[in-house]
Amino acid sequence: MVEKLQEQMYVIPLGGVKRVPRWRRSAKAMKDIRAFLSRHMKSDDVRLGQDINEKVWSRGTEKPPARVRVRAMKLEDGHVQAELAEE
């Protein structure tokens, strides 16, 4: 079994998605979440949970949330697993 090395909570701002066309905003939000976690957790292999995907796409492609609260775990094999934080 793979052990987790580091666990961190982040509130990821998604204000930058307002600068892209409306029909592309949720896809851009998913890319921004992955890039944020890659930068802060120092890993290129980031795996997002299905619950994050459902939260971002819940209001369609034109209206993603302004911010997402995420729990990220860096595992000993080097990849980062992210899940939506319970509120």
Curated annotation (Swiss-Prot):
Pfam families membership: Ribosomal_L31e (PF01198)
Q: Which PROSITE patterns match?
A: RIBOSOMAL_L31E
GO biological process entries: cytoplasmic translation
Q: Which keywords, in A-to-Z order, does the entry hold? A: Ribonucleoprotein, Ribosomal protein
Which domain of life does the UniProt lineage start with?
Archaea
Cellular component, GO annotation: cytosolic large ribosomal subunit
The GO terms describing molecular function are: structural constituent of ribosome
Instruction: Give me the gene this protein comes from.
Output: rpl31e
Quote the protein name from its UniProt record. Large ribosomal subunit protein eL31
Family of this protein: Belongs to the eukaryotic ribosomal protein eL31 family.
Question: Which InterPro entries does UniProt cross-reference here?
Answer: Ribosomal_eL31 (IPR000054), Ribosomal_eL31_CS (IPR020052), Ribosomal_eL31_dom_sf (IPR023621)
